Amino acid sequence: MGKYNLILSEYLSFIYNSQSAVQIPIYYSSNSELENRCIEFHSKCLENSKNGLPLKKLFVEYSDVIENATLLSILSYSYDKYNAVERKLVKYAKGKPLEADLTVNELDYENNKITSELFPTAEEYTDSLMDPAILTSLSSNLNAVMFWLEKHENDAAEKLKIYKRRLDLFTIVASTVNKYGVPRHNEKYRYEYEVMKDKPYYLVTWANSSIEMLMSVFSHEDYLIARELIVLSYSNRSTLAKLVSSPMSILVALVDINGTFITNEELELEFSNKYVRAIVPDQTFDELKQMLDNMRKAGLTDIPKMIQDWLADCSIEKFPLMAKIYSWSFHVGFRKQKMLDAALDQLKTEYTEDIDDEMYREYTMLIRDEVVKMLKEPVKHDDHLLQDSELAGLLSMSSASNGESRQLKFGRKTIFSTKKNMHVMDDMANGRYTPGIIPPVNVDKPIPLGRRDVPGRRTRIIFILPYEYFIAQHAVVEKMLIYAKHTREYAEFYSQSNQLLSYGDVTRFLSNNSMVLYTDVSQWDSSQHNTQPFRKGIIMGLDMLANMTNDARVIQTLNLYKQTQINLMDSYVQIPDGDVIKKIQYGAVASGEKQTKAANSIANLALIKTVLSRISNKYSFATKIIRVDGDDNYAVLQFNTEVTKQMVQDVSNDVRETYARMNAKVKALVSTVGIEIAKRYIAGGKIFFRAGINLLNNEKRGQSTQWDQAAVLYSNYIVNRLRGFETDREFILTKIMQMTSVAITGSLRLFPSERVLTTNSTFKVFDSEDFIIEYGTTDDEVYIQRAFMSLSSQKSGIADEIAASSTFKNYVSRLSEQLLFSKNNIVSKGIALTEKAKLNSYAPISLEKRRAQISALLTMLQKPVTFKSSKITINDILRDIKPFFTVSEAHLPIQYQKFMPTLPDNVQYIIQCIGSRTYQIEDDGSKSAISRLISKYSVYKPSIEELYKVISLHENEIQLYLISLGIPKIDADTYVGSKIYSQDKYRILESYVYNLLSINYGCYQLFDFNSPDLEKLIRIPFKGKIPAVTFILHLYAKLEVINHAIKNGSWISLFCNYPKSEMIKLWKKMWNITSLRSPYTNANFFQD
């Protein structure tokens, strides 16, 4: 097996380098004779080490085990005291420690002062402004770097340069940390006052960021960027990232387009060799110069110089360096402010009387009309979702905080919890559940706040509203989103599109007589001026809608929604400030409502339309596209004449002046060739993404385990890598080793092997080969997968007790009764399971499950339990298929231009050969006829797993399932008796398999799986008519071909001769595939 086990063994001898340390490898095998040898080998190793005898002889004696069995884990003993980090660090602490400049940041606590200066006593201390919020420690991070450095000190040539660059940067970190001593973390990986009081407050988070940056250094340019950011971020904890990334919004406007990809009528990307010149007025260069000056004022030298040098010829070839700077700037870590400052920030905007009422009127009307347009059809037709909005809300209620901790009784158990789902159950049990009354959020009941931290931006506050707000808004917002799904203007929601489609949309209309206007409206969304017109527009829309129906329940839904808007127009928030809780009248819009995303998109669309209608009084142009994407909006305007510098400048100034008339503090820019928005930027006709995901600092703490976080770390590393920011893979693997190790006692630790962590099981954390998802098909792989499946789900006593209480049971049966027209076990069980799963966010339950999981894992890692499972996984299917394929060499020419320059070479090569896709493959079954039928009559949304289970039942059972969900008998009969039903079987199976194979994640989401170039490498003679089997054979072949190409940069072709007799067997098996959830799949999902 691969590199991981090798590094693991080297890492262990690096960490435990004393005489007393022992490493015992544990092997397993699916072959019973060899397995017995494995067991013998293990017990002899234990015996020898207990008696202080060396293990070398055993390794020779049991060479058959070492050569033929699979490494399961490594057991490591060490009686060493744990000051090893400090000892090793001294060797590297040869430089001059950094001194923080304590005047850089406006807010006193953002300066990197000694902790006791910021917080004189332990009572005042909080780690919330510098908490790395990750389940790994600074000492582990230092160890991982020192391990890498020691391993590579004898590198040669180019590798030696990388070593020297990193060593130089680590010297800065080591010297600074060593000056104060390595802060020791507690068992929750937090840094307490006693540890921090004599050290700079931001030392830990700074060191983590710096380590992340220095381990991402390869070239000399990387080194210069990293050095500057590491040194300056030690002092500047507030504006550094913003300063460094600001110029990008202008840089994208400077590069000529010479050939680009555009979206064609079929929504595919096609190459266009058009040439568009960048028209840049002097004013733009002045603004850029100002930005570079601001950077220099802040002490930056190398980075502004790189940008200055690039400006000489503004070439797309050298643009990736600009992209790199832009990505690196985020890796200085999160800016975490006090809640009070975050809230006051939005309240400081001056209110002027001098605004254009006419524009505000137009803005409000546009919001009103859009709300009406979105909801008109469902309201007129008395849509059942709007009738049963309360039930729909309850079914999709989250288990997030409800804003206050309450004492709740479940049977004989009394617990304290803040979770929404538990509050709802408790309220129902005690007759306090009144969804028809939306509680006020005024001065008597101010809103508690959550927070959102982002690198390079101020902290934003989030409303934690009572659950009644969610129930009132859910159904209506869902209907708005359905409308947005087939409206191109809403880039974020547009049906199954991905970022590449939006890219082709912009470049489509760029030409010498058009310009693109792009605006960052994030300031506007949270500004006070927006709130009244915004809420009023929505209210007016709801009033108009209420007149379009006579259905009392629909009117009630609209009225409750309206009430949430009315209440929020008079909102107060509560902010803890020291001991007191301050109540502040908060007149701005904040995130936290269900409608946040949808409503902001509506408002931003209304805003750009208002501005454009003003501009059109002065210029004559055609609006080719208008798009809104989150906090950004953009539009392409086509004029009758060629665009000149003067025109760009005039339009730009007029647009800004128009925004100013609404007192909207937004950043509006006009360009002829590119745009920059939060999600992506287009320069020189190519698309770029910011690779700004922090690896060693997290935004907030959740209830995920170390394993989960190791998987998230790997997943973040992959996303960054696809976007052009590469961190040393060995370092990432070292972090995974540290984070997945399990302590047995103080001196005894167990480290799982690569096989355990990469096999597609409930414990999967990473892929042995980046970008390639392998599904093991060897005996040992399937054996271990089976073993892990035997201990997959852990029980929790607390959860069982809650689930057995009448409060819980009554709640679940109440949901079932409201939803179902007749008995339906599948749905009832499903609801109960979903509700029980929501309990996991209650800490004591997740802790209990974690402990059980770990003890089961410990047993398993020392000796896998043989477990004959009847469950079939996707691995079994692929294992059956594999033998019937024969491989031969093939050749595919490169035939597409690059349009995503930051991709790693091996991924880029595949796109250049087979092309890319601009759509998401449907993997949730929502396009199937049965799913549409259910959503036509019921608010219940079955998961892909449930659809997969239901569609394979007997026809009469499917009928009963449908009828119980309120589908009229005639419709259910028609469905089962029609061709559509057999098409559905195939379609749902297809969706389910796509889902299992994570086809929309990682780099697979970039490839065109239906590429004719790919198809011609695969030959499968057509036998018998089982489309499902043909599908899986083709998909397997495509994945094999693509994986081979990623790994080797060359193509193979596959021929399959699948016997007819086997087909029916395989088809039967395909209806019993179990899906596996793992930290790895969670991390993928988390990216979404």
From Swiss-Prot:
Signal peptide: none annotated. Its main location: virion. Residues 501-687 form the RdRp catalytic domain. It is found in: Virion. It catalyses: RNA(n) + a ribonucleoside 5'-triphosphate = RNA(n+1) + diphosphate. Its cofactor is Mg(2+). Gene3D superfamilies: 1.10.357.80, 1.20.120.1390, 3.30.230.140, 3.30.70.2480, Viral RNA-directed RNA polymerase, 4-helical domain. Keywords: Magnesium, Nucleotide-binding, Nucleotidyltransferase, RNA-binding, RNA-directed RNA polymerase, Transferase, Viral RNA replication, Virion. The keyword Signal does not apply. This is RNA-directed RNA polymerase. It comes from Rotavirus A (strain RVA/Cow/United States/WC3/1981/G6P7[5]).
